[in-house]
Structure formats: C-alpha cells, structure tokens
Amino acid sequence: MNDSRRQGENAIGRRQLLKGVAGAALVAVGLGGRRAAAEEKAAEAKPALKGRIKQAACGGVFPKGLSFEEKCKLMKELGLHGHDLLGPTEFETLKKYGLICTMVRGSAGIAKGFNRKENHEECVDKAKVAIEAAAAAGFPNVIVMSGNREGMADDVGLANCVEGLKKFAAFAEEKKVTVCMELLNSKRNHKDYMCDRTAWGAEMCKKVGSPRIKLLYDIYHMQVQEGDILATITEFIPYIGHFHTAGVPGRNEIDDSQELYYPAIMRAIADLKYDGYVAHEYGPKKDALESLKKAIAICDV
C-alpha cells in the first residue's frame, strides 16, 4: 500500500471518529438537557408551602440513623425553615443548607431555672452566652426554663423569674434575640414544673416588660395541663414567641389518631398574624418520614 492511499484511509478514519465523538457528545448534551428539564419540571410540580405558618423541626421527628447533614438536606427538601434546640456546633451545617436554628439552647435544665434566686447567676450567664451566639449567627430565639417548685409558692417563683429575666432583657433587646420560657405540663410529664399555665407565664412577661421576653407555647403540654387551646392562644398571643406541636395523648403524630385538630389551631395562629415559628416536637410511632410530611401538610393552612 502506497503512502498516499494509507494517508487517505487514515484521514477517513479520523473523520469517522470525530463524527462519532461529536454524535456521542450531542446525545450526552441532549440527555443532560432532558434530565435537567425533567428535574426542573419535578421541582415545579412539587407543591410549594403556603407559608402562613413557618415550620421547623426538633430532632426526634426524623427517621432514625440520619446524620445531622442528612437531616438538613431533608428539612430543605421538605420546605422547613430550620431546627429547634441546637447549639453553635450545628450552626455552620444549618447555614450551608440555608436553614436556621429556630430555638437556640440557653437553659440550665428543666428543673433548675429562674424561679430560684440562687440559680440566677448560672441561668443568666447561660442565657447571655446563647443570646450572643444566636445574634452572631442571625438566629431569632433562645430557650429558658422556670425550674421546679420544690415547695415554693407560685407568686414567689414568678417574682424571682421576673427579677432574673430583667438582668438580661436589655441585652436581648440590643442583640435582637427573643428569649422564650417554655410552658410545660406538670400534670403528667414534668411534675412540679412551675411555668405550667399560660396566664402565669403571660403575667411574668408583662412584669418583665420587654418585647424580647416571651413564652414558648407547647401545644401538647398546654392541652394536657389546661386545654382551651384556641381561646388561650388568642388571648395571650402577644406573649407567645414560639410554638411546639405534638399529639395528645402520647406526644406522637399530630394526625387524626389524637384529639387535637391542628388545622384549626394553625389557622387561628396564622389569622392572629403570628410571624414566629412552629416546630414539630412529637415522637413518631409510624413511618417517620411519612409522618413528618403529613405534619407539614396538616400545618400548611
């Protein structure tokens, strides 16, 4: 075979190869384009939340075995705003996914709280550290507790809580962080806890006199303790800075397996122009992911 013929055949081979590569590239681009279009269509098809209720989650509602990063991915996918009851070690991962810590840990524990003066130094220090961390991260809330009665009269405990909270109320105002004392039932789950009635907590907030001192209204706990949920929320909404959900009885799913009708509760909260967060804090008995999706749908009014 002479050199000119060989060169001609090589040229033809190169042209065929280039055509094949170009064709494959076009196919790949086409497939990639179709895949991107399909993903975009799927994203568009996914129903957006109405947004009247800004929802978040606590750790116990997720499927077991998920890493914190996997939980963040899931929260983002489901349209949640963030996660309750975390500290600074989790903040970076939350921010990576465009999420927030909707309630930063700031208490010395449930039993040890502001109702005893001897606890004030520790409780104030912990609260101020949490407020500083929340402010630096741009997060809205910090949780505190009243503490247990241990024989103390409620009016004495209320006065002590007011005194303790006033020690950092101005600091919270300066940092634009709201400190929420949680309402818990003492009837069943937290025997002897002092901040167990909404009226008591609201009176405490009134006496502190700061827009940055409010209540964390746990719907489960207050149904167990005092009932009358809709009327109570309506009366005391100016003093409520955060909500928790769970079913009654059992503290499980908020679906129709329990006694509270959450759609009506959420509509009432939304109609009151509440602009804070509602965090799910139940313990799932059923499939955790499906229960979480359902809880979000129930509260999306």
How would you label these PLM feature ranges?
Residues 2-56, 61, 65-76, 138-140, ...:
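Histidine-acidic metal/acid-base catalytic patches
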Residues 20-31, 44-49, 113-214, 224:
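Active-site acidic/histidine proton-transfer and metal-coordination neighborhood
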Residues 61-63, 87-89, 107-109, 148-150, ...:
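Active-site-proximal loop/turn and secondary-structure-junction residues that shape catalytic pockets
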Residues 71-90:
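Catalytic domains of carbohydrate-active enzymes, especially glycoside hydrolases
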Residues 76, 95, 135, 173, ...:
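Anion (oxyanion) recognition and catalysis
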Residues 92-104, 177:
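Short acidic, glycine/proline-enriched helix-loop-strand junctions
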